Amino acid sequence: EVEIEKINKIINFGKKINKNEKDFENKKSEKNFFEKTRELLGNDSVLKNSQKNEYVDLYEKYMRKVSKETTIKSAFHLPMKILEKGQYHITTGEIDVESLKVESKKYGTTIGKYLLSVYFKILLDRYSQAKNPIVIGVPVDLRKIFEETTYRNFFINITPSVDASLGAYSLSEIITYLDNYFALKITKKEFYKSIYKAMNPMQNIIIKSVPYLIKRMFFPFIFDYYGERGYTTGFSNLGIFKVNKKYEKYLKGFRFLPPPSKRCKIKMGVISDCNKVYVNFGNLTANYDIERDFFVYLRKRGIKSKIITNYF
């Protein structure tokens, strides 16, 4: 009961902050939020380990004047009609973790990379005539790379891409490509370039002088044009979500819903526990061919999925 009371207090405090989002942009309010969270959680080990760098903006800390990262400016986009505003279709596949482990080991890869490879395979087979490259945005947690602890966001999207015009790709070819791409891109040196590209515009004096409300109005359009224009879709893998054992009996499973995007239209989010992997598709269209093809592909390889949706 004490633990539940603490959680409720945190939720209510978060709602209070949410009412004045602009005020939360102020570092003093942000600091107040995290101090209140620590007070309510007590001696939580994760919070304790994060105390040193909890308010540090690590993007600024690691920004160096290096050459800018080169990315694809215009990716292939799914030719589907968007649903009416307010609709977001979710398809979740609950999969036994052992069956995925067995299959991914056949290719000498991880479960996350195997699922990403299958996603690429489905898109390449379905859109083999795509003129622009098929690009999947994959967020990487930089806190692990730079060995940092912070409450603030610190991630960068990497953008593996495959040119469908080069011909058909086997799953093995895609996995080999991703192994090489990840080995090259997931390094501190490469992320310095990514951080510089992301942060450099924010150092512009003109942009700094623009009032917050105006930024709030135009930033979504800028992000859509300069950011997600270069993605076909997104793939986020949170990995294993660990919960205190005393709470496990109250949980039926997990969901990780990827944020909707008019440009990408369909995204995938993956989260796991010790027994199952939960593959979640977020879809802003009424076309479910990609989701169907994905789970059918796994089923043909002996990987069964329990499918749950919010639209049937």
Walk through the language-model features, giving the residues of each.
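Acyl activation and transfer enzymes in specialized metabolism, enriched
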Residues: E1-E5, I90-S128, V279, Y288-D289
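Alpha-helical scaffold elements adjacent to nucleotide-binding pockets in ATP/GTP-utilizing enzyme cores
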Residues: E3-K6, I10, Y177
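Alpha-helix initiation and N-capping motif
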Residues: I4, F34, K52, V56, ...
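Amphipathic alpha-helical recognition patches that constitute DNA-binding helices
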Residues: K6, N32, K36, S50, ...
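Short loop/turn and capping residues at structural boundaries
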Residues: N8, L115, T309-Y311
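Short amphipathic alpha-helices and their capping loops
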Residues: I10-H89, E94, K144
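Acyl-thioester-dependent acyl-group transfer interface
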Residues: N12-E25, T92, K101, L124-F312
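Charged, low-complexity, helix/coiled-coil-prone segments
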Residues: D44-L47, E54-V66, K113-R126, T233-K245
